[in-house]
């Protein structure tokens, strides 16, 4: 990306939160990039960043397989901010002491600021932070002072202000840290001296140029589902290369109610794109017959999607690229070279080795909320930009266990009722994601004086900014009651409704 703005580099040491650090910085109007911990000091120097952040990670700095960085990075003279593992790595490098904690600390803790370094400027002396660590700094390196403590962590923050080196044992990038944003701001602006200058207009300008350079006079296929991500990808690429783009819409039978018809109307008629509709419902259902394992379902759906594209591409001339709506969160949840895998993602896993296309993923540095902003900037209607996040495997991972036509119909109809009532209640912009899922369990009920033994439908609704962390949504009881009554009365073979009150972490947003 052209350096028309200040940049903060984030080094990836494996934390599942590492993408959030870059995300928070971009919220401030400062560009941030995530790079592997193996990047060299020379490579960083060539990027001319204003500062460096070391992310957290699951390893121990003294353990076998510990991740390290090029030690010359410490000699660049740039401000460095170490978070959790990053602080421990800094401690080890400068001769301090890191040991295993007697009790691992996960969750909220009260931080007490002992030394108001630039990092804590204008912040309260006591604040709630999010801890997630099994090791502790027990001995400061020479030249460092203790900035903050907590009940279980005597050195929860440290600094060497002469060298612009800072470390914290907690995670300011996670929204559970109540002043985390302000603390990162203090590093970005107060320590590094950055100026605001990055926004979505910059991104569009640079990305359009990048797409044109990458594609040249070749042709691109776009996996269009009608969801936010694929819609924005399609419009962005169409804006860059026009009729060189062909969109293929695969109706795999795992879509929401009315979605297939809506996709064709919006993009073929509304945006005047070349959209080919493929009816592959029977093909997908045959492949998924008898399959219960969620990872296997994801892989099958991912593979079959690509095979369908292969079949369609063979009918077209000179298709070289496949466009996907892969986001930053997709990549981190599927694991990187350093991040531990949570689940394989539909845009990352399941791709066959002999795939005939080169991938083009213009959104893979953006978070979901940034994609919505991008969509609005591109002139995409609100009803698409604010559409509910919907996974590539569709309802296939909202039917737990084996997928059948009957179960799909239950999820499809119950989900339509949920969406309708949430919109009626004016909650559709407040709740980040909401859907129904079918856990596959049956229970006894009574309907019309008769005993029933039917399915339970689960409702999942969460509030979030970017999908990395989420809290369950406090939907008013009267709205939940309406939803419950309607689903039980209008959807066949359902006699019980449950509401998921689990946050992420420990749960993921989707049930599979």
UniProtKB/Swiss-Prot annotation:
Provenance organism: Bacillus cereus (strain G9842)
Gene label: guaA
The Glutamine amidotransferase type-1 domain, residue ranges: 7-197
Active site: 84, 171, 173
EC number: 6.3.5.2
PROSITE patterns given in the database record: GATASE_TYPE_1 (PS51273), GMPS_ATP_PPASE (PS51553)
Keyword terms of this UniProt record: ATP-binding, Glutamine amidotransferase, GMP biosynthesis, Ligase, Nucleotide-binding, Purine biosynthesis
Subunit note: Homodimer.
An example molecular function term from Gene Ontology annotations: ATP binding
Protein name (database record): GMP synthase [glutamine-hydrolyzing]
Matching CDD domains: GATase1_GMP_Synthase (cd01742), GMP_synthase_C (cd01997)
Pathway: Purine metabolism; GMP biosynthesis; GMP from XMP (L-Gln route): step 1/1
SUPFAM superfamilies linked: Adenine nucleotide alpha hydrolases-like (SSF52402), Class I glutamine amidotransferase-like (SSF52317), GMP synthetase C-terminal dimerisation domain (SSF54810)
């Amino acid at each position: 990306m052209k350096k028309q703005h200040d940049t903060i580099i984030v080094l990836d040491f494996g934390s599942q939160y590492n993408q959030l650090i870059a995300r928070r910085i971009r919220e401030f109007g400062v560009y941030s990039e995530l790079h592997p911990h193996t990047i060299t000091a020379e490579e960083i120097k060539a990027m001319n960043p204003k500062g460096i952040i070391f992310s957290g990670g699951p390893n121990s700095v003294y353990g076998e397989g510990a991740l390290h960085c090029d030690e010359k990075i410490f000699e660049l003279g740039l401000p460095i901010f170490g978070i959790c593992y990053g602080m421990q790595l800094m401690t080890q490098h400068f001769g301090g002491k890191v040991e295993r904690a007697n009790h691992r600390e996960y969750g909220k803790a009260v931080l007490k600021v002992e030394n108001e370094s630039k990092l804590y400027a204008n912040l309260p002396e006591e604040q709630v932070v999010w801890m997630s660590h099994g090791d502790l700094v027990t001995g400061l390196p020479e030249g460092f002072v203790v900035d903050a403590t907590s009940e279980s962590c005597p050195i929860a923050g440290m600094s060497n202000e002469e060298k612009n080196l800072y470390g914290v044992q907690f995670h300011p990038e996670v929204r559970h840290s109540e002043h985390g944003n302000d603390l990162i701001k203090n590093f970005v602006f107060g320590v590094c001296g950055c100026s605001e200058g990055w926004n979505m207009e910059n991104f569009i300008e640079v990305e359009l140029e990048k797409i044109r350079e990458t594609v040249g006079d070749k042709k691109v296929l776009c996996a269009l589902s009608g969801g936010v991500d694929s819609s924005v990808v399609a419009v962005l690429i169409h804006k860059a290369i026009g009729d060189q783009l062909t969109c293929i819409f695969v109706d795999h039978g795992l879509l929401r109610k009315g979605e297939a018809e809506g996709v064709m109307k919006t993009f073929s008629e509304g945006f005047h794109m070349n959209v080919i509709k493929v009816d592959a419902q029977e093909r997908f259902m045959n492949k998924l017959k008898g399959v219960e394992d969620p990872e296997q379902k994801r892989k099958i759906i991912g593979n079959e999607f690509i095979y369908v594209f292969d079949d369609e591409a063979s009918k077209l001339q000179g298709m070289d690229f496949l466009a996907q709506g892969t986001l930053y969160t997709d990549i981190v949840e599927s694991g990187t070279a350093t991040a531990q895998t949570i689940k394989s993602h539909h845009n990352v896993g399941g791709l066959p080795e002999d795939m005939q296309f080169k991938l083009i993923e213009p959104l893979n540095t953006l978070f979901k909320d940034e994609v919505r902003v991008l969509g609005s900037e591109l002139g995409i209607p609100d009803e698409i930009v604010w559409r509910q996040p919907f996974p590539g495997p569709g309802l296939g991972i909202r039917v737990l266990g084996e997928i059948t036509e009957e179960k799909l119909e239950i999820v499809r109809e119950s989900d339509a009722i949920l969406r309708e009532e949430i919109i009626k209640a004016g909650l559709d912009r407040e709740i980040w994601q909401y859907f129904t899922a079918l856990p596959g369990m049956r229970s006894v009920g009574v309907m019309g004086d008769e005993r029933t033994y039917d399915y339970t439908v689960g409702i999942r609704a969460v509030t979030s900014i970017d999908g990395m962390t989420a809290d369950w949504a406090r939907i008013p009881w009267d709205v939940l009651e309406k939803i419950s009554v309607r689903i039980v009365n209008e959807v066949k073979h359902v006699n019980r409704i449950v509401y998921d009150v689990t946050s992420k972490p420990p749960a993921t947003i989707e049930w599979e």
